[in-house]
């Protein structure tokens, strides 16, 4: 806004139009015959007091086509302006030449006392012929065709210069205008702010609707209170914090995308009114809070007054945003740690599988060697042990041992899913989980864990997470149908997902039907995301029903009872007792019930023994055999020694008998001495 003292001057000019003004056009010789005199139209529109208000550029776009052709620059003459004495007396300090279709500035003689000069809405291309107006304070050249700022060096008293809507490309030739208070350059083609650092008294600078891409070089404008930069191409702002008196800054409709590009505004202590509307930054959800947080002294934002409630919210939101950032950073760290841990677990798993494959190959080679005493379970050579290192690849073994123990497993609860990575994660089932957490888990995922190790913790899983209904297996070495038997000990399974990666069992065509048959008491709903239908259950029974019957019929009764749990032993005994009854005696309902119980019992005989458990049993059998062998060997040795002693006795006995008889005869040959000897022995014994 222009100071009131200039506003009043322009107002008077608007109300007191110079209606008696004469223009005299003459050649350079100034001869009387070449003079042409004409009078300006008395209905000339008054000067509307146009200043640097924010609507200065409102009609800019609509006026672009209003220009008409310029007077040829080769024209040798300038219009000469002359006014009567009466007019000079009435309007001594102002002159309005608005909308006169002027292409050049006329020569103004005898008007050195002018303080206001208005050339609005003409076709002037160059500022000239006004250097003699050294008392001029207000110069309005709005809406002309000026391409360069010139001809102003002598106007040292000029306070208001309005050059809006011209063709100026560069700010220049303002060195002598040190008293300039208002400078309007809106609607031009300026690309850079320059040559204004000496304007220490400038209070209003309007550069709206130009081609500025950045704002800087504002040092020295110590009195600037208003800066209008609307409708440019500005991407960043600098040096605004060096303007100690700046109160209003208008940056609407530019290309500002972040607060960092205008961060210098936060350092300004004088700004009270600022606009960002029409910028990409104004579309962001954090825009208003960020601006208010960094510029607490603002009174208006985007032409709207800032309330105390908005300030309060702005002071709270940053704390929440900071907490969100910290939480986001924490989550990022956790995700990265999770990723690294999973990669480490996967690498360890891969090394284990390669070591196991090498061990398996070595075992096959050993089996092709000369016959040795053996008693093995199929697949029992999958596990690799440290003592076999001599036959394993040394590089793989050392790499496996080099992995950190703390990085080889991961336990994660995400919503309703418990994810376990690595065999060490199974130890989490020994923790004291809260009732709420344990009850929330419905899905358990096993990754990079041997299935045989999982089997050992299934009873704990059933107790710790009673609501687990969905099991996922990925990279768990599920290689045969028999392994699915181990899942029967769980309480309930509604869904089962077996990832093909690391589980060769899914390559079997009928594996899903076997799962449905063996785990029929669970009434599963989905397998690998596919709904289970009644036809699937019927097909599973047809394919594998005979298998359970054969398995149960081949087992002795004592083995059957040992396999069944206590809860099923009574059912099994009931079935055995019912075999002797006639079919007609038992009602149809009872028969169906027994048949159902029998089917479950038959399926129970299809169990799974882990390789580790089998190896333990195998070692136990070997120990028993060894004990029996040693015991028998000791008995044989003892019997042999007894026999040898008996044979030696038989050889020595005849001679010993003769000696005994001889000693007895000699001893009793003297009856008295023999009796004394006997009495003496009796006495000695007492």
From Swiss-Prot:
Please name the taxonomic classification of the source. Answer: Eukaryota, Metazoa, Chordata, Craniata, Vertebrata
Where does it reside?
Answer: Cytoplasm, Cytoskeleton; Cytoplasm, Cytoskeleton, Microtubule organizing center, Centrosome, Centriolar satellite
- Alphabetical keyword list: Coiled coil, Cytoplasm, Cytoskeleton, Leucine-rich repeat, Microtubule, Repeat
Q: How does it assemble?
A: Part of the neuronal tubulin polyglutamylase complex which contains TPGS1, TPGS2, TTLL1, LRRC49 and NICN1. Interacts with PCM1; TTLL1, TPGS1, TPGS2 and LRRC49.
User: Can you quote a single GO CC term?
Assistant: cytosol
Q: What is the organism field in this record?
A: Mus musculus
Q: What does this protein do?
A: Subunit of the tubulin polyglutamylase complex (TPGC). The complex mediates cilia and flagella polyglutamylation which is essential for their biogenesis and motility.
Output the Pfam families linked to this UniProt entry. Answer: LRR_4, LRR_9
Designated name of the protein = Leucine-rich repeat-containing protein 49
Q: Which residues form a coiled coil?
A: 319-341
Q: Does the keyword Acetylation apply?
A: no
């Amino acid at each position: 806004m222009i100071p009131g003292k200039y506003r009043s001057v322009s107002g008077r000019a608007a109300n007191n139009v110079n209606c008696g003004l004469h223009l005299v056009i003459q050649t350079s010789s100034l001869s009387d015959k070449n003079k042409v005199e004409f009078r300006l139209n008395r209905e000339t529109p008054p000067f509307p007091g146009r200043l640097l208000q924010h609507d200065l550029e409102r009609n800019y776009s609509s006026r672009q086509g209003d220009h008409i052709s310029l007077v040829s620059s080769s024209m040798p003459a300038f219009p000469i302006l002359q006014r009567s004495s009466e007019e000079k007396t009435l309007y001594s300090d102002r002159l309005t030449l608005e909308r006169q279709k002027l292409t050049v500035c006329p020569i103004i003689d005898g008007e050195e006392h002018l303080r206001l000069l208005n050339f609005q809405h003409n076709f002037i291309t160059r500022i000239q012929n006004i250097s003699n107006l050294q008392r001029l304070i207000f110069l309005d050249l709005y809406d002309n065709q000026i391409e360069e700022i010139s001809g102003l060096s002598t106007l040292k008293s000029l306070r208001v210069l309005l050059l809006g809507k011209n063709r100026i490309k560069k700010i220049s030739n303002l060195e002598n205008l040190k008293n300039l208070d208002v400078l309007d350059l809106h609607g031009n083609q300026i690309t850079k702010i320059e040559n204004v650092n000496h304007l220490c008294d400038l209070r209003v600078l309007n550069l709206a609707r130009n081609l500025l891409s950045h704002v800087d070089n504002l040092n020295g404008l110590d009195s600037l209170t208003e800066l209008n930069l609307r409708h440019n191409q500005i991407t960043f702002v600098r040096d605004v914090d060096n303007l100690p008196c700046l109160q209003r800054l208008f940056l609407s409709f530019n290309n500002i995308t972040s607060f960092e590009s205008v961060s210098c505004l936060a350092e300004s202590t004088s700004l009270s009114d600022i606009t960002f509307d029409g910028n990409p930054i104004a579309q962001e959800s954090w825009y208003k809070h960020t601006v208010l947080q960094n510029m607490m002294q603002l009174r208006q934002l985007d032409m709207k007054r800032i309330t105390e409630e908005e300030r309060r919210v702005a002071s709270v939101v940053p704390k929440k945003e900071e907490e969100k950032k910290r939480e986001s950073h924490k989550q990022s760290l956790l995700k990265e740690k999770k990723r690294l841990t999973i990669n480490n677990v996967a690498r360890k798993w891969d090394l284990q599988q390669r070591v196991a494959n090498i061990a398996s190959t070595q075992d096959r080679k050993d089996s092709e060697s000369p016959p040795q005493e053996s008693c093995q379970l199929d697949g029992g050579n999958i596990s690799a042990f440290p003592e076999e290192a001599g036959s394993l690849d040394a590089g793989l073994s050392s790499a496996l041992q080099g992995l950190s123990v703390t990085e080889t497993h991961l336990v994660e609860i995400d919503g309703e899913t418990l994810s376990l990575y690595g065999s060490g994660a199974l130890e989490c089932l020994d923790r004291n989980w809260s009732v709420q957490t344990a009850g929330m888990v419905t899905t358990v995922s096993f990754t990079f864990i041997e299935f045989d190790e999982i089997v050992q913790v299934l009873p704990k899983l059933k107790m710790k997470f009673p609501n687990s209904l969905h099991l996922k297996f990925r990279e768990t070495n599920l290689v045969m149908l028999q392994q699915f038997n181990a899942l029967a000990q769980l309480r309930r399974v509604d869904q089962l997902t077996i990832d093909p990666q690391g589980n060769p069992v899914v390559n079997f065509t009928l594996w899903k039907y076997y799962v449905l048959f063996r785990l029929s008491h669970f009434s599963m709903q989905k397998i690998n995301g596919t709904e289970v239908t009644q036809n699937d259950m019927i097909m599973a029974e047809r394919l594998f029903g005979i298998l359970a019957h054969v398995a149960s019929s081949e087992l002795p009764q004592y083995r059957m009872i040992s396999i069944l749990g206590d809860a099923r032993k009574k059912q099994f005994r009931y079935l055995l007792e019912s075999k002797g009854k006639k079919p007609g005696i038992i009602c149809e309902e009872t028969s169906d019930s027994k048949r159902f119980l029998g089917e479950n019992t038959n399926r129970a005989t299809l169990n799974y023994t882990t390789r580790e458990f089998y190896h333990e049993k195998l070692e136990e059998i070997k120990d028993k055999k060894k004990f029996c062998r040693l015991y028998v060997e000791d008995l044989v040795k003892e019997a042999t020694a007894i026999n040898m002693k008996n044979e030696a006795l038989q050889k020595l006995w005849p001679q010993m008998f003769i000696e005994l008889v001889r000693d007895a005869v000699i001893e009793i040959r003297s009856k008295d001495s023999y009796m004394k000897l006997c009495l003496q022995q009796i006495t000695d014994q007492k």
